[in-house]
Amino acid sequence: MRLRNGTVATALAFITSFLTLSWYTTWQNGKEKLIAYQREFLALKERLRIAEHRISQRSSELNTIVQQFKRVGAETNGSKDALNKFSDNTLKLLKELTSKKSLQVPSIYYHLPHLLKNEGSLQPAVQIGNGRTGVSIVMGIPTVKREVKSYLIETLHSLIDNLYPEEKLDCVIVVFIGETDIDYVHGVVANLEKEFSKEISSGLVEVISPPESYYPDLTNLKETFGDSKERVRWRTKQNLDYCFLMMYAQEKGIYYIQLEDDIIVKQNYFNTIKNFALQLSSEEWMILEFSQLGFIGKMFQAPDLTLIVEFIFMFYKEKPIDWLLDHILWVKVCNPEKDAKHCDRQKANLRIHFRPSLFQHVGLHSSLSGKIQKLTDKDYMKPLLLKIHVNPPAEVSTSLKVYQGHTLEKTYMGEDFFWAITPIAGDYILFKFDKPVNVESYLFHSGNQEHPGDILLNTTVEVLPFKSEGLEISKETKDKRLEDGYFRIGKFENGVAEGMVDPSLNPISAFRLSVIQNSAVWAILNEIHIKKATN
């Protein structure tokens, strides 16, 4: 009997374990499928947005055709020989168009009138590849003749060798040869076809070069900012190269990332970039930065390339590309009546840094003749000591004594972790939003892998509702109200504070972290995520 009971108990234990394992496996698979569906939905949403943008572009192109019809109508007015070439329907259309007086919209030809001299000025002189479209990420690599050493082959190997098979189907690498010497261009193409024949035939790699007629006369440029005539010509041509490459790449994918021809990359870079972008799909960012150096690793949403190219064309002779990009952000969000700190906070919402850097510059000899550049990205080998999120625009302040420049402002903007000397009772960290925000949840993480013991202890999380009166809140929430109008909604446990915000408290004017008791350790804050409500 004991044996039978023991056998039954063993069988029951086995069945229970099996059912538990089956349930967990089903739940885990369901969770993974849900995450995959969410990513597919975000990608679909982004493609719909791009489709809307392209419809708008087509409308603009049709308007241009209408303007051309008007010019034809004006030029053929009174010329019977010319008019006899058109059908009755065309003559009727020309008459209708010519009779309408509408304003002319300026185009890029105003800034680059030389393009009108040749119909093929905006068509690649050389174009190798399958013309792949519909990918997530387009990588643009401009390359020009270097006097000492070319790094292009090594760069492409680094990019391609660090892609998984499925990732190779979801991107395209466009190599732009910024030279008009057709023999040189064909030589580069031959080398690339020999080294990357499989990648070119599959559609992963494309190679283009511009026609000579694309470039204006660059011999009489104004010298500015103390740059020599040669350097001014170099940076001006570089701006034009970027524009041609962006225009070609825009129709190919959801995102466009600007690279250079003398870099190496980290493992898993593609998945990291794509997931980071998808996490920010609900935010109004303009630039994601995956490197600290120059124009390397700067990623844009494809529809935004139109504005960027137009802006660069307007000022391509005036300043380098990185300065022009900063000017675009300034024009979009900075208020001349506010101070520089306010402007930096606003720009930080459009220009988001990812840490650590995914791309490292390795070229010693610049494409500018005679220039040696020992530039390396210091963040490339650094461990990830902070986690970046996009938070609502806010003015931040603290009573804590900051250690070695690890400021709260840098943490909130995703540039560095916050590090402060031993907190005492009464110390605070304050995030005062520029305008009231509906907040869904919050997460504050203290300490990091280098200093895991520097955490916030005996610290509470408090919010200040925008409305001080008339709040329809529960008794439980009401009991959390403090004398100064803040509500205590959470606290740090084991260095972490996270939770949901009672919707009845929204919109929120400020978040505050308040130290209740003296601490025996310093404090690091390496993650701040104040998540806005979606509705």
UniProtKB/Swiss-Prot annotation:
Instruction: Write out the GO MF terms.
Output: alanine-glyoxylate transaminase activity; alpha-1,3-mannosylglycoprotein 4-beta-N-acetylglucosaminyltransferase activity; metal ion binding; protein homodimerization activity
State the protein's name: Alpha-1,3-mannosyl-glycoprotein 4-beta-N-acetylglucosaminyltransferase A
Where does the record place a coiled coil?
A: 28-63
Side of membrane Lumenal, spans: 28-535
Q: Which family does it belong to?
A: Belongs to the glycosyltransferase 54 family.
Quote the InterPro entries the UniProt record gives. Answer: Glyco_transf_54, MGAT4_A/B/C_C
Q: Name one GO cellular component term.
A: peroxisome
What are the BP-aspect GO terms? glyoxylate metabolic process; N-glycan processing; protein N-linked glycosylation
Task: Spell out where the chain is glycosylated.
Answer: 77, 458
EC assignment: 2.4.1.145
Q: How is it modified after translation?
A: N-glycosylated.
Which positions bear Phosphoserine? 474
Q: How does it sit in the membrane?
A: Single-pass type II membrane protein
The transmembrane segments are 5-27
Q: Which gene encodes it?
A: MGAT4A
Do you know which PANTHER family this protein is assigned to? ALPHA-1,3-MANNOSYL-GLYCOPROTEIN 4-BETA-N-ACETYLGLUCOSAMINYLTRANSFERASE A, N-ACETYLGLUCOSAMINYLTRANSFERASE VI
The listed locations are: Golgi apparatus membrane
Q: How is its activity regulated?
A: Inhibited by UDP.
